[in-house]
């Protein structure tokens, strides 16, 4: 009744820089990001993770996960709002996430049954993540790193999984993570009085926090299959 496996997919962010597309993990114009090694190319923002799942019954299971992802955005992208394109900010950041949550299967999913099993599912819980503190030096459009911080997020996952073989489960899922910070993109830096004049002030909306989204596949191996 236990599973261990991996998550592989793309990532994107929703906040105060660049487009506001909710799910867009795969292609990004990184020509303006000084932090990228491949200047002028299309960049894929990825997410990789490890999963452990404990199945209590055919409907309910607990999940522990560790995910690493890179995120970024650019005001100059064509799908950005006009005022953002004129502002011209861009950034790149990383996220290291530890999460615990509950999966609910909409259809009975018996991991001990040798027949093919499949079901849509949802998941939610709580995650602790670390990320880089960013800020924008006056006259420079790309954000720079100046530290790190920890924060929490609430994941909301929808997915579909299938057990085509006795010991393996394949899943396809999208997880939107609502954070408790508005600073994944560096739009709300906290500067001391000495260096503050060298950097831009806060910008963007203060009415909502940033989100990050993971879209991809899971592959898990079943072990300890005893009722």
Task: Label the predicted regions.
Residues 14, 59-62, 110, 166-170, ...:
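Repeated loop/turn-to-beta-strand initiation elements of outer-membrane beta-barrel proteins
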Residues 163-227:
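Predominantly the C-terminal beta-signal and adjacent terminal strand-loop region
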Residues 42-46, 94-98, 116-118, 146-154, ...:
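Residues that define the transmembrane beta-barrel architecture of outer-membrane proteins
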Residues 1-53, 212-216, 220-226:
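Short glycine/proline- and aromatic-enriched beta-strand/turn motifs that initiate or cap beta-hairpins
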Residues 6, 10, 50-54, 100-106, ...:
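Residues on the lipid-exposed face of transmembrane beta-strands in outer-membrane beta-barrel proteins
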Residues 21-27, 78-86, 138-145, 187-196:
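Flexible, surface-exposed loop regions and adjacent strand-edge segments
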């Amino acid at each position: 009744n236990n599973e261990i496996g991996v998550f592989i997919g793309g990532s994107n962010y929703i906040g105060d820089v660049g487009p506001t597309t909710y799910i867009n993990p795969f292609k990004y114009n990184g020509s303006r990001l000084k932090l990228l090694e491949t200047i002028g190319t299309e960049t894929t923002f990825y997410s990789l993770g490890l999963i452990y799942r404990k199945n209590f019954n055919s409907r309910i299971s607990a999940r522990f996960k560790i995910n690493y992802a890179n995120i970024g955005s650019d005001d100059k992208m064509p799908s950005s709002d006009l005022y953002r394109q004129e502002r011209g900010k861009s950034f790149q950041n990383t996220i290291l996430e530890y999460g615990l949550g509950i999966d609910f299967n909409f259809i009975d999913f018996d991991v001990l049954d040798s027949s093919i099993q499949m079901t849509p599912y949802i998941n939610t819980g709580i995650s602790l993540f670390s990320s880089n503190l960013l800020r924008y030096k006056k006259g420079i459009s790309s954000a720079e790193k100046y530290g790190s911080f920890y924060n929490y997020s609430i994941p909301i996952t929808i997915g579909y999984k299938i057990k085509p073989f006795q010991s393996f489960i394949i899943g396809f899922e999208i997880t939107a993570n609502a954070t408790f910070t508005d600073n994944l993109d560096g739009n709300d830096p906290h500067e001391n009085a000495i260096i503050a004049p060298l950097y831009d002030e806060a910008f963007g909306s203060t009415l909502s926090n940033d989100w990050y989204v993971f879209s991809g596949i899971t592959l898990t191996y079943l072990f300890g299959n005893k009722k």
